[in-house]
Amino acid sequence: GTDYTSTADLADKTVVAEAGSAGEAAISEDENLSKADYVSKSVQTDCLMEVAAGTADAAVLDLTLANAMIGEGTDYANLKIVDELNAEEYGVAFRKGSDAAAAVDAAFDELKADGTMQALADKYDLALAD
């Protein structure tokens, strides 16, 4: 188990994140995490290695990656996700009315209709956007 209950518990601890990432921004923007001993890493997987090795107390990284790499059946079965700091949403932009936009919309509609998109979301522990 962990004694972690909020970011206040990490104010004097070593926290790692990927340099230039949203995790790094979250650390600098959080009142408590900004007081932590922050160590930047070149890739998010290095952050997990630091926590697993005990050289860092916590890592701030993308939730999708964390869900895929942490927990039972992974190389980091002894680690767990204990908090979500913020949500990021991404989109893809096309010129309005373009053939590319129409093709992608049609593909998404088909993947939703036949259940493929939901199956992929379930497989990777993701939530579909509305």
Model-derived features: where do they sit?
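Short, well-ordered beta-strand segments
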Residues: 14-17, 59, 93
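Short helices/loops that flank or line small-molecule/ion binding pockets
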Residues: 8-11, 29, 44-60, 64-65, ...
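Short helix-initiation/N-cap motifs at beta->coil->alpha
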Residues: 2-3, 39-53, 88
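Periplasmic-binding protein-like
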Residues: 63, 67, 71-109, 127-130
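Conserved functional loop/turn residues at catalytic and ligand-binding sites
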Residues: 14, 55, 115
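Stable alpha-helical elements in mature extracytoplasmic
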Residues: 6, 23-26, 43-47, 62-66, ...
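Ligand-binding clefts/hinges and TM-proximal coupling segments of bilobed small-molecule sensing domains
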Residues: 22-39, 77-84, 106-130
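Flexible hinge/capping segments at coil-to-helix
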Residues: 1-14
